[in-house]
Amino acid sequence: MDDYKYQDNYGGYAPSDGYYRGNESNPEEDAQSDVTEGHDEEDEIYEGEYQGIPHPDDVKAKQAKMAPSRMDSLRGQTDLMAERLEDEEQLAHQYETIMDECGHGRFQWILFFVLGLALMADGVEVFVVSFALPSAEKDMCLSSSKKGMLGMIVYLGMMAGAFILGGLADKLGRKRVLSMSLAVNASFASLSSFVQGYGAFLFCRLISGIGIGGALPIVFAYFSEFLSREKRGEHLSWLGIFWMTGGLYASAMAWSIIPHYGWGFSMGTNYHFHSWRVFVIVCALPCTVSMVALKFMPESPRFLLEMGKHDEAWMILKQVHDTNMRAKGTPEKVFTVSNIKTPKQMDEFIEIQSSTGTWYQRWLVRFKTIFKQVWDNALYCVMGPYRMNTLILAVVWFAMAFSYYGLTVWFPDMIRYFQDEEYKSKMKVFFGEHVYGATINFTMENQIHQHGKLVNDKFTRMYFKHVLFEDTFFDECYFEDVTSTDTYFKNCTIESTIFYNTDLYEHKFINCRFINSTFLEQKEGCHMDLEQDNDFLIYLVSFLGSLSVLPGNIISALLMDRIGRLKMIGGSMLISAVCCFFLFFGNSESAMIGWQCLFCGTSIAAWNALDVITVELYPTNQRATAFGILNGLCKFGAILGNTIFASFVGITKVVPILLAAASLVGGGLIALRLPETREQVLM
């Protein structure tokens, strides 16, 4: 009995060396009952049969059958991992050879434009709310805090989408999850143009942001797996042009659609579909077109091989090869690959079958299984062998996002500040004026009236814009059909005066004294001061800022594979930091626009190199997950940068400039600690 140390689950014994031997008998089987002695085994009826207890012979047979699988499970995770890593390394080099045979041609260019539209939709999403807000705030009566939440909710959604959908793409497939991502964005972006309430609009933009948040990580992971090493850096950089195109598209559409107030309709008094809603729908078109076109593209063969789907991957690679060869005029060339290495599969997906559970139980098990796989994959990126690369990349991504998005919001805010200061410098001040029996039916704008006296005056069908009445006496005056913006009465005495059909609400009268005055049928609707005109200069600024990255995109694409990813990141971030100091000389609108274009043009190379090196540093089964984590952190940096930089507008330029420069210098230097991936095959 020394060789048998423990009892198994079936009442038998297992050897002490940890392996089952099917030809060894259980020692207890030698002991026979006196009751059954002398009976034929064929005639014997096992008494436990009626109680559902398995016969010892059945147990023995089952143990013998299960022995090989138990032996496999006892080999340990370490051996399986080592074997899988060896398989993945062999596959990486073989796949590189296969992509060289497939060539770079028509297939990659078709996929380039399809995925480019998805990336364009990501660029549009960043701008659409900020462009629509000046008009939407009137329809929804938005306060400053609500407008701020709308601006932030898009980034929150994109941050969540990057985390979730990036992880799913490594488990369910690039094409499948990207299609889901685009469908969610297109649906809720379009729906947001029809909803009337602030809460519903906020919710739609949040879900829309979650949908498009997964586009960037998946697009770069997806496209990289159809590129050979020699083409990867350059063509991933070319793909970045579509993000710039998204900004141009949004700016151009806002400029051409939103000012046309007649481009809409009304249904009754409560439902209004104005031109800004048309703009929101138009901005969903790139996403919709990309979603439809993606239906005709195949799944990534590299992902399929990672999942052990050899035949399906082979068919797609043959399709890539044949498409490119036909386009080059050599259709007779045969795809010579017959067998491709597939990594050993470590975990099998298990779910309850229809005969053993209800539909919601099966979906619950499926959800839990996928969630655990995605979570474990994410933990592996930040705690496994890639943790140092992930940490360095996280710092660089955050530094870039904090400075870039912070300054791109700060630039328009500073331009508005310069406009406001110039506007205030032209303000007219009237002191001690006396007006009797006048009829005023024109626009009064940018004026201050102090210590005046207005008697028996009539204000009718007029517009007050940025007007202040201070310490003024109104006697027997009549206000009819008056509209106002940023107009206030301060320390005034108002006697025997009638206000009929005006929007001069109670909060516009500050410390005023009323004597026998009456308010009749005040205007309904929003009681807040809202600008009547859209600032077209802001559209122009965004358009020029997006256009300015084109030279940087071209240069980075041409040099990416020549000078390497690290020099591109470090050089671009350090040059951008130097450009920040020129902002001290930005004391006018035109100067600020010029420095913005310079900053955007120099920083885009770092963004492109970051996209490329992030794709190349991680293996196929972690590529989209890691990209999603880093891109989600990027959106968090954008939120933080927007909030901090905007708080210093009109106070000081020193803090935003120093913060941006320090962030860029620090990120650029830390990036140099990353490994160069220019000559690396895609694992």
Curated annotation (Swiss-Prot):
Modification type Phosphothreonine: residues: 36
Glycosylated residue positions: 441, 491, 516
Region (Disordered): 1-42
Extracellular side: 130-148, 204-205, 259-277, 412-535, 587-592, 650-653
Top-level lineage group: Eukaryota
Location of this chain's protein in the cell: Cytoplasmic vesicle, Secretory vesicle, Synaptic vesicle membrane; Cytoplasmic vesicle, Secretory vesicle, Acrosome
GO cellular component: acrosomal vesicle; membrane; plasma membrane; synaptic vesicle; synaptic vesicle membrane
Record-linked CDD domains: MFS_SV2B (cd17438)
Transmembrane domains' residue ranges: 109-129, 149-169, 183-203, 206-226, 238-258, 278-298, 391-411, 536-556, 566-586, 593-613, 627-649, 654-672
Residues with Phosphoserine modification: 33
Molecular function terms from GO: transmembrane transporter activity
Keywords assigned: Cytoplasmic vesicle, Glycoprotein, Membrane, Neurotransmitter transport, Phosphoprotein, Synapse, Transmembrane, Transmembrane helix, Transport
Quaternary structure note: Interacts with SYT1 in a calcium-independent manner. Forms a complex with SYT1, syntaxin-1 and SNAP25.
PANTHER family the UniProt entry points to: SYNAPTIC VESICLE GLYCOPROTEIN 2 (PTHR23511), SYNAPTIC VESICLE GLYCOPROTEIN 2B (PTHR23511:SF2)
Function of the protein: Probably plays a role in the control of regulated secretion in neural and endocrine cells.
Name this polypeptide is given: Synaptic vesicle glycoprotein 2B
Organism: Homo sapiens (Human)
Gene that encodes it: SV2B
